[in-house]
């Protein structure tokens, strides 16, 4: 019986090793080219002369409800933001504009790279009543989908998954 089990295990090992010899290329372009094309597509969609309405859910358990941001992405990697909760923030008007990046990390990502009093309100600790952990929000988002007409982009927060 033990000899049969060993023979079956050896046969399974050999068959699995043979099955790994599939070196056919399924794509016409390299991975890096496809990644760059995807990032360019998202950059184009963000900057397509549109002002975006961003529905934002800061807590992973949706504890704070949804908030509305109005964001405008510019060609020079700057984003202007207005926040529904702007009455809660003593913002310097110059800091409602900050840098953003579209880059590849765990997938194509949108990152609000420099501090913005509105866009980082839920993610940074401080004197906004959130204490040392902040409100547990995101400032890095994974692109989940882009509509063919470039009129809807679905993002998912890296930290909260919302």
PLM segments and residue spans:
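Acidic/polar, low-complexity intrinsically disordered N-terminal segments immediately downstream
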Residues: 21-109, 148-149
